[in-house]
C-alpha cells in the first residue's frame, strides 16, 4: 500500500521544482531593465538557455534603444513601449544571471547559439524593487545587430 502512495505522489512531487522555477509573478514587468555585456558560463540547454552577463563598469543605455526595430511575435507584447521605458538597474552587480527562452523557441527565432565571450544585450525584467539575486528574465535579446523576441514564437 505504501508503495502505491509513493508512486501516485511522484508526478506531483517531481513537478514542484519546475513550477517553482517558472513562477514569474515576482518579476516586475512594469520596469524593463536593459543589460549589455559579455556572455560567461553559457548553458545552451532546456528547460531554457541561461548565461551570466558580465557588465562593464560604465554601463549606459544606448542612444538608439528607444527607436530600435523589434520583430513581431505571436504574443501581444508592446515592445516599443518597453524600449521607451527601459532603464539600467539601480543595483551595482557586475554579473547578472540571464534566463532566456526554451531552446525550441530560440530555434524558431533562429537565434545563433551564444558562446562565452560574445557581446550580448538583453531587455527584460528582474524582481520587484530589484530585491533578491541579480536575475533577469529576458524579453528581447540583441545579437549581431538583430533583435529577437523571446516571449513567444515569431509571426
Where are these regions (language model features)?
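OB-fold/S1-family single-stranded nucleic acid-binding modules
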Residues: 128-152
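Structural detector for short beta-strands of small beta-barrel domains
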Residues: 32-45
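Short nucleic-acid-contacting surface segments enriched for D/E, G, S/T with interspersed K/R
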Residues: 107-121
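Short aromatic-glycine-enriched beta-strand elements
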Residues: 45-56
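Short boundary/loop segments of OB/S1/cold-shock single-stranded nucleic-acid-binding domains
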Residues: 19-31
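Beta-strand/loop nucleic-acid-binding surfaces
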Residues: 93-109
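N-terminal export leaders
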Residues: 3-7
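N-terminal signal peptide c-region/cleavage motif recognized by signal peptidases
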Residues: 15-17
Amino acid at each position: 500500500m505504501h508503495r502505491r502512495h509513493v508512486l501516485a505522489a511522484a508526478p506531483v512531487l517531481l513537478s514542484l521544482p519546475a513550477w517553482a522555477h517558472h513562477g514569474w509573478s515576482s518579476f516586475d514587468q512594469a520596469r524593463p531593465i536593459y543589460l549589455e555585456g559579455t556572455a560567461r558560463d553559457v548553458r545552451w540547454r532546456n528547460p531554457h538557455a541561461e548565461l551570466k552577463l558580465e557588465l562593464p563598469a560604465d554601463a549606459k543605455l544606448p542612444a538608439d534603444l528607444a527607436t530600435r526595430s523589434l520583430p513581431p511575435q505571436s504574443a501581444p507584447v508592446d515592445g516599443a513601449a518597453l524600449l521607451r521605458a527601459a532603464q539600467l538597474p539601480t543595483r551595482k552587480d557586475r554579473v547578472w544571471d540571464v534566463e532566456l527562452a526554451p531552446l525550441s523557441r530560440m530555434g524558431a527565432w533562429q537565434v545563433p547559439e551564444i558562446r562565452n565571450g560574445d557581446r550580448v544585450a538583453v531587455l527584460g525584467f528582474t524582481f520587484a524593487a530589484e530585491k533578491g539575486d541579480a536575475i533577469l528574465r529576458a524579453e528581447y535579446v540583441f545579437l549581431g545587430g538583430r533583435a529577437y523576441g523571446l516571449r513567444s514564437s515569431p509571426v
